[in-house]
UniProtKB/Swiss-Prot annotation:
MF term (GO), any: threonine-type endopeptidase activity
UniProt name for this protein: Proteasome subunit beta type-6
Cleaved propeptide residues: 1-13
Pfam families the record matches: Proteasome
Any GO BP: proteasome-mediated ubiquitin-dependent protein catabolic process
Induction info: Up-regulated by elicitins (cryptogein and parasiticein), salicylic acid (SA) and hydrogen peroxide.
Main localization, broad class: cytoplasm
Stored InterPro entries: Ntn_hydrolases_N, Pept_T1A_subB, Proteasome_bsu_CS, Proteasome_sua/b, Proteasome_suB-type
Subunit note: The 26S proteasome consists of a 20S proteasome core and two 19S regulatory subunits. The 20S proteasome core is composed of 28 subunits that are arranged in four stacked rings, resulting in a barrel-shaped structure. The two end rings are each formed by seven alpha subunits, and the two central rings are each formed by seven beta subunits. The catalytic chamber with the active sites is on the inside of the barrel.
Entry's localization field: Cytoplasm; Nucleus
One CC-aspect GO term: proteasome core complex, beta-subunit complex
Source organism of this protein record: Nicotiana tabacum
Keyword annotations: Cytoplasm, Hydrolase, Nucleus, Protease, Proteasome, Threonine protease, Zymogen
Amino acid sequence: MENTDVDQPHSMGTTIIGVTYNGGVVLGADSRTSTGMYVANRASDKITQLTDNVYVCRSGSAADSQIVSDYVRYFLHQHTIQLGQPATVKVAANLTRLLSYNNKDRLQTGMIIGGWDKYEGGKIYGIPPGGTVLEQPFAIGGSGSSYLYGFFDQAWKEGMTQEEAEKLVVTAVSLAIARDGASGGVVRTVTINKDGATRKFYSGDSLQLWHEELEPVNSLLDVVFASSPVPMVS
């Protein structure tokens, strides 16, 4: 029987996250890329640099999100040359929105723009499929996001420190990896503030384990029977 899964487009499945904190933003993503039922790449990088202080998290079709990122990077470079100063995060978000909206019938991708500029500080913009742009204190996207809305409602708070924001992002991505079959691999993060951008990498064996992944704990009856293999009543 012919297997058509390998002929399907690369999909980033994906969990992508952007969080603001008191001083900047933290972006995070898993690393699994799928082709049909197959994992095409288990260590892909879904956080793409647009400028020195602006990055984009990509989900959906790998080809679509990559070509949009390439065009946005090119236009931002031209913008910087013409104006003599770096583009703001809002400009990057609006360019991404414009490309997504004008090609909404042909693109299958959702993105999160995050960065820092001297005018507005750290900003996060969510751009779902279709080309809407939403400024948010935090944004989540991709197939793993459906498992995270309740978690973020409880865990996110205004005015977090950098350490708290980084821990929140890594914990959230690891939770999505445990629940979502299309998310997996490692966790990559980018922290962006006035000092620039810092990338971090968290391997799969260093991530927090969740309920289904923990070793089963024996019940009290199991312990009793294990310590007394001979029946107490003959």
